[in-house]
């Protein structure tokens, strides 16, 4: 086993001093965090949208998107609450490909994780301070959470990480909403065991110290579809899937039951335009069944400035990872959600 150090040990306090929220910007973030918590707890009946690019590969494109989203948020704020996806670390099935801003702060240059950490904080800071949007990120590397936990408002534990004990235990110490995706197998027990672990106190080693957490009552479920043994996607946003998920929630007696539908990934088969239909179908299911309306109160939507995806970062605001809805389709979908909720 050989590890070669490529930098001095990172000083967490020094990193956190960069791009620090203060004054009115901090106050605005804390206010929005309180609103988000009320939504997860069921005290606020607005629909939650965790929405934005699959990956945040270009700072200026992400900022342009954030400013448009902020304007739209103001128009729909009485029925819809949006947290912007600013995903800076991407899981790769075989380790190849673009791994996110934290690895590669410039998608056209060689990886540099030290500069990547600074870029991640700077981007979250700019979205919050310049656009007024609070942000979501994926906890791909649990040990990196202290580098950004003062900036983010929502955290997702992905399908490949949900069974990992370290991810579950670190999530139990987070003081913000944390969504657990079902694994790629579709096994709901794995997801619910993760939520249970995160909602309870845990003791473990973290960053070289023995720590104890309080438990995170804002941990909840994200349904993202599954893959069968032949690699075919199996959606799990259908009516029966939702009723099964609700039954499991009720059986386990978890706090603050809350279900988000991930409209892309294996629910859409990465056919990005399918996200629109999945939202529509879920809203119909909410109308049909009061339990679904009570439990299913959020969507995760992948969108950017331009429709689709590209292999290289050539078109401004077009994804270089999974395909996304472009801005025109995004705006139309959010307005449609808003109108449907008012009917």
Where are the predicted features?
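N- or domain-start disorder-to-order transition segments that initiate the globular core
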Residues: 1-41
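Glycine-rich phosphate/diphosphate-binding loops that line cofactor/substrate pockets in enzymes
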Residues: 37-45, 251-256
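Conserved phosphate/anionic-ligand binding catalytic regions in large, soluble enzymes, centered on
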Residues: 48-61, 322
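Conserved, mostly hydrophobic/aromatic
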Residues: 52, 261, 326
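Active-site-facing alpha/beta catalytic cores
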Residues: 66, 79-244, 265-270, 274-281, ...
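Redox- and metal-dependent alpha/beta enzyme cores, enriched for Fe-S-associated oxidoreductases
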Residues: 245-250
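Internal helix-turn-beta structural module
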Residues: 303-341
């Amino acid at each position: 086993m050989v590890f070669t150090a490529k930098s001095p040990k990172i000083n967490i306090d020094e990193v956190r001093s960069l791009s620090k929220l203060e004054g009115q910007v901090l106050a605005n973030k804390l206010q929005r965090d309180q609103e988000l918590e009320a939504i997860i707890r069921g005290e606020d009946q607005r629909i939650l949208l965790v929405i934005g690019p699959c990956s945040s590969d270009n700072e200026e494109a992400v900022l342009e998107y954030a400013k448009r989203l902020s304007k739209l948020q103001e128009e729909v704020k009485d029925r819809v609450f949006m947290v912007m996806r600013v995903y800076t670390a991407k899981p790769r099935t075989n380790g190849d490909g673009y791994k996110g801003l934290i690895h590669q702060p410039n998608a056209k240059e060689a990886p540099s994780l030290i500069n990547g950490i600074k870029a991640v904080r700077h981007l979250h800071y700019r979205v919050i301070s310049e656009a007024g949007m609070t942000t979501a990120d994926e906890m791909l590397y649990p040990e990196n959470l202290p580098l950004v936990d003062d900036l983010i408002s929502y955290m997702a534990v992905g399908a490949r990480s949900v069974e990992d004990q370290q991810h579950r235990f670190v999530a139990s110490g987070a003081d913000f909403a944390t969504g657990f995706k079902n694994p790629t197998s579709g096994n709901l027990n794995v997801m619910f065991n993760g939520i249970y672990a995160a909602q309870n106190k845990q003791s473990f080693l973290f960053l070289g110290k023995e720590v104890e957490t309080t438990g995170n009552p804002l941990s909840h479920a994200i349904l993202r579809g599954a893959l069968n043994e032949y690699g075919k996607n199996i959606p799990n946003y259908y009516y029966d899937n939702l009723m099964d998920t609700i039954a499991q929630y009720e059986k386990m007696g978890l706090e603050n039951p809350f279900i988000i539908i991930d409209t892309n990934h294996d629910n859409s088969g990465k056919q990005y335009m399918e996200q629109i239909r999945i939202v529509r179908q879920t809203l119909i299911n909410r109308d049909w069944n009061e339990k679904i309306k009570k439990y299913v109160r959020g969507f995760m939507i992948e969108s950017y400035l331009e429709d689709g995806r590209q292999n290289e970062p050539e078109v401004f605001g077009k994804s270089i990872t999974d395909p996304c809805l472009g801005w025109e389709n995004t705006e139309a979908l959010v307005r449609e959600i808003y109108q449907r909720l008012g009917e």
